[in-house]
């Protein structure tokens, strides 16, 4: 069920992400994710342009003749599915490459918001954390890949593959974007992937709204070059206002997806 308060807060965190990337103390930590984003997007854009015609022809071959009168609509939906699959490829690759930089950016944003250091690790300790960060990215890939494969197989079913699958793919992409970027502040505090997934699911409207805005902006030229650090900053603010007190400093507290959490935003006073 749609929660209007969560819808509003999801939009708020996305907008605030744009505000944070302009802050003087964060600019140098924003540059590297932007550079990586630019290189990856250029490479995948070239790949997309070179393969889009063949991909469309392949998908359209599954449309039966008796649905030819809907060919224009089905063509648009097929292109949307292909775009989302390319987008999933982009976020997967960028997640592995940019994980250390995004984790550091999330740490600096949290320090700016709270005035507290997450840890006092030196450069050597940070480098030792890189394998753990990459393992976390692999965990996200293991979670998402079976679902992407299932959606891909469903796309072979006539009509279903060109109507329902694009919608399901978009919703799943929104959910994965929330997981992808919220994971950086969660992981900085060693919060497990399953706990993170469950608490984000308890506020699903907020998560899908935030992830949906990130997804849509990825397809907008110029804006898509900045979206990675924007999403990290917005997700970190979401962590601080919604989850930090419950999870970051009270890890002995057991969590149950059946019971949930009473999560409040300190700034708004809204129970989400």
Curated annotation (Swiss-Prot):
InterPro entries according to UniProt: CysZ_sulfate_transptr (IPR050480), Sulfate_CysZ (IPR022985)
Top-level division of the source organism's lineage: Bacteria
UniProtKB keywords: Amino-acid biosynthesis, Cell inner membrane, Cell membrane, Cysteine biosynthesis, Membrane, Sulfate transport, Transmembrane, Transmembrane helix, Transport
Pfam families from the UniProt entry: EI24
Subcellular location: Cell inner membrane
Transmembrane segments: 29-49, 66-86, 148-168, 219-239
Membrane topology: Multi-pass membrane protein
One GO cellular component, as annotated: plasma membrane
One MF annotation (Gene Ontology) recorded for this entry: high-affinity sulfate:proton symporter activity
BP GO annotations: cysteine biosynthetic process; sulfate assimilation
Family: Belongs to the CysZ family.
Functional summary from the UniProt entry: High affinity, high specificity proton-dependent sulfate transporter, which mediates sulfate uptake. Provides the sulfur source for the cysteine synthesis pathway.
Protein name according to UniProt: Sulfate transporter CysZ
């Amino acid at each position: 069920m749609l929660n209007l308060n969560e819808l509003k807060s999801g939009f708020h965190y996305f907008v605030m992400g744009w505000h944070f990337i302009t802050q003087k103390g964060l600019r140098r930590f924003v540059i590297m994710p932007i550079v990586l984003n630019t290189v990856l997007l250029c490479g995948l854009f070239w790949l997309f342009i070179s393969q889009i015609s063949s991909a469309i022809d392949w998908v359209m071959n599954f449309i039966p003749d008796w649905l030819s009168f809907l060919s224009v609509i089905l063509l648009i939906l097929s292109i949307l599915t292909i775009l989302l699959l390319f987008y999933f490829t982009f976020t997967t690759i960028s997640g592995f490459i940019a994980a250390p930089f995004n984790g550091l950016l999330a740490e600096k944003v949290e320090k700016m918001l709270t005035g507290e250091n997450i840890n006092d690790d030196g450069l050597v300790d940070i480098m030792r954390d890189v394998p753990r960060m990459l393992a976390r990215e692999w965990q996200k890939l293991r979670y998402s890949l079976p679902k992407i494969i299932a959606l891909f197989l469903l796309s072979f079913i006539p009509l279903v593959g060109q109507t329902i699958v694009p919608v399901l793919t978009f919703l799943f992409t929104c959910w994965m974007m929330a997981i992808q970027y919220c994971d950086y502040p969660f992981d900085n505090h060693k919060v497990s992937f399953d706990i993170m997934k469950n608490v984000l699911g308890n506020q699903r409207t907020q998560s899908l709204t935030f992830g949906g805005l990130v997804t849509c902006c990825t397809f907008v030229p110029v804006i898509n070059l900045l979206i990675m650090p924007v999403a990290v900053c917005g997700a970190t603010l979401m962590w601080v206002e919604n989850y930090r007190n419950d999870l970051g400093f009270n890890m002995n507290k057991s969590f149950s997806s059946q019971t949930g959490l009473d999560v409040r935003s300190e700034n708004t006073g809204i129970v989400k």
